[in-house]
């Protein structure tokens, strides 16, 4: 249940080639009440929106009794919104190669990045299964049924 939604704006001042530049970073923060209570910890260098989808999938997997992974190594990327829609990211080819290098079985990919992911898989003859997803529910259904 969504308890609270907050918008934050951060400004960053940088100097590049003697010129001062201001960058703005807008963030939507959602506060949900969960049962059971979850406590998440992150390393200092883990940030960015491209892990939102997989974080959501990991949380879902912890909240249910079933084992969605069934012993498979599952990797993926994509942003996620409050409605569970998975959004595109940059650098998917590097993420596909990294997933293959770590011996992943399944790589979940936003639909907007799917063609690039498949091209990377074919170009380097990678063995992992690339699955196109539009929503968190797509990934859950795939894992339950495959």
Q: Language-model features: where?
A:
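Peripheral, non-AAA+ core regions of ATP-driven protein-machinery
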Residues: 1-146
């Amino acid at each position: 249940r969504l308890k609270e939604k907050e918008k934050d704006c951060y400004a960053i001042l940088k100097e590049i080639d003697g010129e001062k530049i201001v960058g703005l970073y807008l963030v939507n923060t959602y506060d949900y009440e969960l049962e059971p209570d979850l406590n998440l910890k992150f390393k200092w260098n883990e940030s960015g929106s491209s892990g939102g989808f997989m974080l959501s999938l990991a949380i879902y997997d912890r909240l249910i009794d079933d084992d969605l992974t069934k012993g498979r190594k599952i990797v993926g990327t994509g942003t996620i919104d409050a409605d569970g829609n998975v959004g595109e990211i940059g650098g998917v080819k590097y993420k596909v190669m990294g997933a293959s290098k770590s011996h992943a079985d399944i790589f979940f990919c936003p639909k907007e990045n799917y063609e690039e992911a498949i091209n990377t898989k074919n170009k380097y003859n990678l063995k992992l299964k690339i699955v196109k997803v539009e929503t968190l529910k797509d990934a859950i259904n795939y894992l339950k049924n495959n």
